[in-house]
Amino acid sequence: MESILMIFAKLPEAYAPFDPIVDVLPVIPVLFLLLAFVWQAAVSFR
């Protein structure tokens, strides 16, 4: 079971160039949360 998880933990070699993009993906929801606060501040928290 652990060997299967290790295979999925590392991207296949074909997707190696996209590795930096995959590292950034988890941050995107946080950016949307910050965007919501900036938007509400812009409209004075109506």
From Swiss-Prot:
It is a single-pass membrane protein. InterPro entries: PSII_PsbK, PSII_PsbK_sf. Keywords: Chloroplast, Membrane, Photosynthesis, Photosystem II, Plastid, Reaction center, Thylakoid, Transmembrane, Transmembrane helix. Its main location: plastid. The keyword Membrane applies. The keyword Chloroplast applies. Pfam families: PsbK. GO terms for biological process: photosynthesis. Residues 1-9 form a propeptide. One of its GO terms (cellular component) is chloroplast thylakoid membrane. The chain crosses the membrane at residues 25-45. It is found in: Plastid, Chloroplast thylakoid membrane. One of the components of the core complex of photosystem II (PSII). PSII is a light-driven water:plastoquinone oxidoreductase that uses light energy to abstract electrons from H(2)O, generating O(2) and a proton gradient subsequently used for ATP formation. It consists of a core antenna complex that captures photons, and an electron transfer chain that converts photonic excitation into a charge separation. Belongs to the PsbK family. PSII is composed of 1 copy each of membrane proteins PsbA, PsbB, PsbC, PsbD, PsbE, PsbF, PsbH, PsbI, PsbJ, PsbK, PsbL, PsbM, PsbT, PsbX, PsbY, PsbZ, Psb30/Ycf12, at least 3 peripheral proteins of the oxygen-evolving complex and a large number of cofactors. It forms dimeric complexes. PANTHER family: PHOTOSYSTEM II REACTION CENTER PROTEIN K (PTHR35325:SF1), PTHR35325. This is Photosystem II reaction center protein K. It comes from Stigeoclonium helveticum (Green alga).
